[in-house]
């Protein structure tokens, strides 16, 4: 595009008006080389951890190789990860299974700065991904679960869907954990055909 040299002052004022931009979301397709093997490993585990989330989880399987790979994606946008939350009551690296009967709610993940979801069900409904929301109450896409808008976590009439990442096999979604988000839908009725 060719510009008019007489508009140089306008260009500088536009450049000075940029905000402090922030990366909120990274999508990585083809995360695992041997995704079928990872899926089989996941399905061979005990899904016996039940908590304040839909479905059931395994214990955490966080390892150096996975941490390094995630760190390489996040570093340019968020700097070095200093806490992988490896205590017994955290779920970093765990597998989660849920079925069509499960339900979620709009929430944030207050205990960390970034969150991640890796889709491990082949041929899943693409509409069963992760949705991101803006509050109709205060217009914010960021918050904490104890905010007043968090009281409306299950009332989707109080929210606008502002972004969605589809569920694609072997897709990793990394996102700022203070964004309002939820799982879009669930499917299946057993570990082999449920949302992993």
What are these regions (language model features)?
Residues 98-196:
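Catalytic core of non-heme Fe(II) oxygenases with the double-stranded beta-helix
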Residues 3-106, 129, 136:
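Non-heme Fe(II)/2-oxoglutarate
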């Amino acid at each position: 595009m060719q510009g008019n040299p007489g508009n140089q002052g306008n260009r500088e004022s536009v450049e000075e008006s940029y905000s402090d931009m922030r990366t909120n979301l990274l999508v990585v397709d083809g995360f695992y080389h041997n995704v079928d093997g990872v899926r089989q490993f996941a399905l061979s585990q005990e899904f016996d951890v039940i908590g304040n989330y839909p479905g059931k989880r395994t214990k955490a399987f966080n390892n150096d190789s996975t941490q390094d790979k995630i760190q390489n994606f996040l570093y340019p946008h968020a700097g070095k990860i200093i806490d992988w939350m490896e205590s017994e009551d955290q779920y970093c690296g765990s597998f989660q299974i849920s079925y069509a009967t499960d339900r979620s709610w709009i929430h944030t993940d207050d205990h960390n700065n970034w969150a991640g979801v890796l889709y491990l069900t082949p041929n899943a409904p693409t509409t069963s991904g992760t949705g991101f929301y803006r509050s109709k109450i205060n217009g914010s896409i960021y918050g904490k679960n104890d905010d007043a808008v968090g009281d409306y976590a299950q009332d989707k009439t109080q929210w606008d869907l502002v972004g969605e990442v589809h569920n694609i096999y072997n897709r990793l979604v990394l996102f700022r954990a203070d964004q309002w988000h939820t799982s879009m839908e669930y499917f299946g009725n057993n570990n082999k055909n449920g949302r992993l």
